Amino acid sequence: MKPTTIALLQKCKQEKKRFATITAYDHSFAKLFADEGINVLLVGDSLGMTVQGHDSTLPVTVEDIAYHTRAVRRGAPNSLLLADLPFMAYATPEQTFENAAIVMRAGANMVKLEGGAWLADTVKMLAERAVPVCGHLGLTPQSVNVFGGYKVQGRGDAAQTLFDDALALEAAGAQLLVLECVPVELAKRITDALTIPVIGIGAGNVTDGQILVMHDAFGITGGHIPKFAKNFLAEAGDIRAAVRQYIAEVESGVYPGEEHSFH
């Protein structure tokens, strides 16, 4: 199989072909996802909650991300692999570049950063140094203490700010953007305005791609289940069939449905 590239996702956007992505944290699941047709994987700092058992993503370190990135890369050698830079790992441009180098050497193709226009200079610095960047707007879990919890973002007056943030990140050189927990109407406006692919999670079926935390997709998340999540394993019966169903529903636009969306 040929390596999946950012250019391929760009082509999907241009041809209006939706694509499915998912989080992965280990060799076995990475291989399974790649074998079944999900070729864009994220080593997310969500591992702090799903793998390590913390109540937020804040305790995750760069070393944690690098460890799991190496494992995922071994399982999915041809996948496009995104890796989060965790909380406090990109406070300065110099620190950002050093930490990006660590996860890129571990096997990532791209780093993901949470934040808006204030990150533009950092994104530009990375892009100029051949480090591909995925932005992340809306509900950014590293800011949970600022938001006061996990809440929908981009409603009312905040919509224009979030829209402007998206434009600023693209202008700075970001090549992908994740939108999390934003109203469908705003997600469509941003997706239509940007030339780069937009991946949604809790942003309706109007984005170019979708992503889910794998534990949510298989119904093995303890405690609160996000509105946007769907347990594909419950319907499909086994994990491989669940992955195929997830892909099919994303590509057809069936998932996410109205019941998974915000307004």
From Swiss-Prot:
Keyword check for Iron? no
**Record keywords: Magnesium included?**
yes
Q: One Pfam match, by short name?
A: Pantoate_transf
Q: Which GO terms describe its cellular component?
A: cytoplasm
SUPFAM superfamilies given in the database record: Phosphoenolpyruvate/pyruvate domain
Q: What is its EC number?
A: 2.1.2.11
Cofactor section: Mg(2+)
**Principal location listed in the UniProt entry:** cytoplasm
Under the heading InterPro entries, the entry gives: Pantoate_hydroxy_MeTrfase (IPR003700), Pyrv/PenolPyrv_kinase-like_dom (IPR015813), Pyrv_kinase-like_dom_sf (IPR040442)
Q: Which NCBIfam families match?
A: panB, PRK00311.1
Its biological purpose is as follows: Catalyzes the reversible reaction in which hydroxymethyl group from 5,10-methylenetetrahydrofolate is transferred onto alpha-ketoisovalerate to form ketopantoate.
Family stated for the protein in its record = Belongs to the PanB family.
Q: Can you say what this protein is called? A: 3-methyl-2-oxobutanoate hydroxymethyltransferase
Q: What is the lineage of its organism?
A: Bacteria, Pseudomonadati, Pseudomonadota, Gammaproteobacteria, Enterobacterales
